[in-house]
């Protein structure tokens, strides 16, 4: 019976993981309509410049683009710096 429980519980976990991934994809597509196509490249380049000086995880960099009206665009950049600054020069 334990073997059966193992396989059944795994399906529930797999379903939850798939559901979360699908929600992320849907949210990205909704948000992606207003983003310029160069934003992923810009984020990658900004991360590369920051990594020249401080070693950070890519998850510590958040870039958000917001359109306010027809002629105003806001690019918000949040970088979480590590507590111990590891200089990589």
Curated annotation (Swiss-Prot):
Organism for this UniProt entry: Serratia proteamaculans (strain 568)
Q: Single Gene Ontology BP term? A: cell division
Which InterPro entries does this entry report, sorted A to Z?
Answer: MinE (IPR005527), MinE_sf (IPR036707)
Q: Which HAMAP family match?
A: MinE (MF_00262)
Keywords in alphabetical order, please: Cell cycle, Cell division
- NCBIfam families linked to this entry: minE, PRK00296.1
**The keyword Kinase belongs to this UniProt entry's keyword annotation:** no
Instruction: Describe its function.
Output: Prevents the cell division inhibition by proteins MinC and MinD at internal division sites while permitting inhibition at polar sites. This ensures cell division at the proper site by restricting the formation of a division septum at the midpoint of the long axis of the cell.
The record's similarity note reads:
Belongs to the MinE family.
Q: Does the keyword Cell division apply?
A: yes
Query: What is the superkingdom listed in this entry's lineage?
Result: Bacteria
Question: What name is this protein filed under?
Answer: Cell division topological specificity factor
